[in-house]
Amino acid sequence: DPLMTSSPSPATTDVSDANPEAQVCDPLFQSFGGRTAFSGPIATLKVFEDNSLVRAAVEQPGEGRVLVVDGGGSLRCALVGGNLAVLAAENGWAGVVVNGAVRDVEEIDAQPIGVRALAAHPRRSEKGMHSGQIGIPVIFAGVVFREGEWVCADRDGIVVLPQAPAS
């Protein structure tokens, strides 16, 4: 399993200390998924209460990237559930950060992937509208997430850098 053999994610505290330019997310997120620490290049989506583009993204090879989903902060439905967490893990995504909610928490927690979201919510999102934007900068939790930049998450928080830190 490539996810389990990947090198350990650097500590956000070390990354933040060594990189004064690092952006640090406001501490708004709950941790889900079987991995509490994850990092990788960013892929971005902006959607609202429709997870069609989220599904389309996690069906693609993740190649160790982290999918950052700006769901507008909506807590009225979940954008990621157990099925999408399984797809993301199977397709090599390192993690998912959701400015919104998730569901099927037990299923997500059973997957070898890191997930951050604002909350859990039992209602599923709309499907099929395919509305949203892919690959654009998204802004939430006091941070600008740009496609191809680098994100690191662990129990201390979420840090964003222009590129992977020197090891």
Predicted regions and their residues:
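Feature captures the catalytic cores and cofactor-binding loops of soluble hydro-lyases/lyases
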Residues: 3-147, 164-167
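A generic "binding-loop/recognition-motif" signal
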Residues: 84, 156-157
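Short, charged beta-turn/beta-strand-edge "cap" motif at the junction between a beta-strand
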Residues: 144, 157-159
